[in-house]
């Protein structure tokens, strides 16, 4: 790819194969809150994906949870809950990993720390087996995600 990047493209550098596989897995499901995936180069570890025109939640509203509108928090919870229900645990819930576009749609990015829960995994889908069996603090991450997405509906 040349130095000039088309305006529809975002190039993320230093992407692990594990993170790429998670992006690819979710991209193939055509989820409306995941940017489109175009290409991954295993040699350079660059991931080419859809550029979302907008700002991160943290940049737009600030880093304090209380400053983020309840509607945005609810959308983030819905995304995290949906991912959990399909077996993906996304513990890196920070305002910098969610983008609000010009239409106020919330997008999720950065799957470096997420992992697949093997007990929910389709037995024919072994893409994550060797990557997600030894996640440090796995149970704590799962509990955090469950508490955030299922137990905090009023705030």
Question: What are the residue ranges of the model-derived segments?
Answer:
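ATP-binding glycine-rich loop module of kinase domains
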Residues: 1-25
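Short, glycine/acidic-enriched loop or turn micro-motifs at the edges of active sites
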Residues: 53, 95, 113
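C-lobe/activation-segment region of protein kinase-like
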Residues: 85, 101-155
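Catalytic-loop of the protein kinase fold
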Residues: 85-95, 100
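Conserved structural core of kinase catalytic domains
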Residues: 33-73
């Amino acid at each position: 790819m040349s130095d000039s990047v088309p305006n529809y493209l975002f190039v993320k550098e230093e992407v692990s194969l594990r993170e790429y596989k998670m992006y690819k897995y979710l991209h193939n499901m055509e989820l409306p809150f995941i940017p489109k995936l175009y290409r991954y180069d295993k040699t350079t570890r660059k991931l080419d994906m859809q550029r979302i025109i907008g700002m991160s939640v943290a940049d737009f509203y600030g880093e304090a949870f209380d400053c983020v509108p309840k509607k945005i928090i609810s959308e983030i919870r819905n995304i995290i809950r949906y991912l959990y229900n399909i077996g993906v645990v996304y513990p890196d819930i920070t305002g910098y990993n969610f983008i609000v576009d010009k239409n106020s749609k919330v997008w999720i990015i950065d799957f470096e720390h997420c992992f697949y829960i093997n007990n929910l995994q389709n037995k024919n889908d072994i893409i994550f087996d060797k990557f997600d069996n030894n996640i440090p603090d796995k149970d704590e991450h799962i509990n955090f995600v469950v508490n955030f997405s299922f137990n905090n509906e009023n705030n």
